[in-house]
Amino acid sequence: MNREISVVDYHHEVLTAWAALRKKLSFPPAVWTLDYHTDTMPCFRGAMPPPLPGAWADENTVADAVRTLRHDEHFDWALRAGIISEAFIGICGDDNQITAHEAMHVVRPADFPGSDVILNSPEKFRPQAEQMLSSSFLAALFPRLPAENEIYILDIDCDYILCRNALYPADDRLIQQLVQNAALITLSRENDWVKILKLPGETITGTEVASIIATWR
């Protein structure tokens, strides 16, 4: 199927595009996500009840969810509603050991420093930050990658990119493969978080990151 790209301001807003893709399929696809940090919160911790299976079919229900959800609660909502089957979430910030749903898999490199080092001693972290889209890094990060001909979503929160050089790894075969074979790519600008988390001296913005990735073919 033809690849689609959706660019939003905030991560939870990707739910709209995920639900639209689900309507075209007879099954829920898996999603592979890259994010600085994932909250893994249950979608119903606020005033919103958990969705019923199949809630993705009603546009008003999805729109209400987007208005109500915050942070990364959309993962739990999408799993409970049957929009996606699994979520493989690669992060570089501190890991959450407990997730809101058993099909939500948060993964982080074992040798990564904690957020205290990333934020307080960023130059020590720069060599790793520059490799976070490299083929070797992504292959080691995810417990599994999409199978050949698998229909899936590639989801990138732009605050995962902490420096401009990260967008240009020497070996970009795997990220390009993930981009080219995805049924849907969702990009969250998250400009405020990119501004907070980017390494010193970097001028990259979430809008720029999303624009660059959206041109990859």
Q: For the regions a protein language model found, what residue spans apply to each?
A:
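Catalytic cores of soluble, metal-dependent hydrolases
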Residues: 1-31, 44, 48, 53, ...
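Long, hydrophobic, well-ordered secondary-structure blocks that form the structural core
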Residues: 31-41
